[in-house]
Amino acid sequence: MRIIATLFLLGSLQSSLQAQNLVSLEMDSSYMNTGFRHTSIKPYVSSDLPERIADSGLINGYTSWVKVEPRMPRMTWKNYYRKRSDTSQYEIGNASNFILIPIYDLQAGYDLKSSAVLMNTVGGVRIGGDFQSKLGYDLRLASGITALANYQDSIARTNMIVPGWGDRAYMLDSNRYGFQHLSGNIIWRPNSAFNFQVGRDKHFWGDGHRSLFLSDVGPAFPYAKLQTTIWKLQYTSLFAWLQDWTMSSGSKNDFRNKFASLHYISFNAAKWLNIGVFEGVVWQGTDSTRSRGFDPNYLNPMIFFRPVEYSMGSSDNAMLGFSVKIRFNRNNVFYSQVILDEFFLKEIKNWSAGWWANKQGVQLGYKCYNFAMVENLLMQTEVNVVRPYTYSHGSPQQSYTNGGMPLAHPMGANFMEVFGKLAYYHNGFSVSGKLVGMRYGRDTTGTNYGQNIFVSYMTRENDYGNKLFQGFATNVFLAELNAAYTFNTKFPLRISLTAIARSERTGNLRSLKSSFVMAGFSLPLWRTHADY
């Protein structure tokens, strides 16, 4: 019987650092080894999953990227407890159209470098259900208090967000932050080819650990989403209501509205080949002459926004992207993304001149499931490179950002990152190790070398002679080890232990080191980002 899959919930701070974009290691492998290969758009809708996965119980404890399925099965208390290993939610009485899940994350830790006590206390509730088999709903409410490691504290102070959750941070005292979280959505699915969603949530577009198109590192945002799957094609259109927090006061009264329209076409060209095309545009809610609001010109479901921009005399922030995914020998996947913020062939040919608006990025990655012929062992490696000034705009309000974080890679631009991971999962037990190495060109007060995408590119240092890592070259190294166990009890419980060592150095100008351990228990329904 198909189980009730939950909507993905947003990140705890340090507890579930090993969670994959895909639902679990087992599910990741099974997902790729079936005919279902539209894996880039997340979260998934559970009714889109192959039946062998939906019925197998693989999503137990790893539902980070599965949305509630409108067509919920009828499940009694007796059947629920008999099938406990297949699900992570409670059902009220005999009803098949209502579920209730507690949200909790209790963690404690210690930073060995700064001798600081770390903690994370989050509590909340998730309510979901369906109406007449075609309409599903979901609501998540939570609040928390956290004390962060020094580099995460720096992010919270600078970007006004709590790393992992992405929600706005409110300073309670010198080292603790409070935050509230509200998200949810309504899904209408009239048939197997079409689904429409409205709500407030996070999204991730890609097959890697990071995404150069759309990532989940920032705040949840209001959205409307249309997805259609026909033949070998899947088309996704996302309309988003974002915010700009760059006003110096930091007051909510100064937050400015901005909007985005994003499209993605996924084409299964062959059993082993998937090709994707991405396009997005961000525009400000007000300009110097008028209040624009949501521009209906961008409701056109067809992609290619540049002609629309030209017809309106607009200078909105539009970009184009491409992705390629190649699968071979069942358990091996190569994936890639290319993002083009600007593309002028004349300047591309004259690459060595270093024109400032050569704003592009590339991702190359490789995953191997059952690595070294060990079942449920995943190996992943990934490289991300983004040139200076990519994602930025002449108007900071139109930068490719939301709230205090980028919409794509958390480092913004002007960087190169190498990522590696080895993870093992078996019968509720998981252990993983990650290594992250980054080099970026740091901006300082009064300079703009292209790393801070919240700053207008009109303040750039030079038109020509720009290169990767320009500015104050900074090296970042992060190592992480995580072990966790999820109990198959009537009350879902996951115990985890995480150790992270991170160093960041800008020559002789700046050095920031952190080594900490975190331990605690949580309901494992989210993924988080603290590895940058």
Where on the chain are the PLM-derived regions?
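Bacterial Sec-dependent N-terminal signal peptides
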Residues: 1-24
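Generic hydrophobic-segment detector
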Residues: 6-9, 196, 326
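Exposed, low-structure sequence patches enriched in small/polar residues
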Residues: 179, 273-532
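Outer-membrane beta-barrel channel domains
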Residues: 21-274, 279-285, 351-360, 367-393, ...
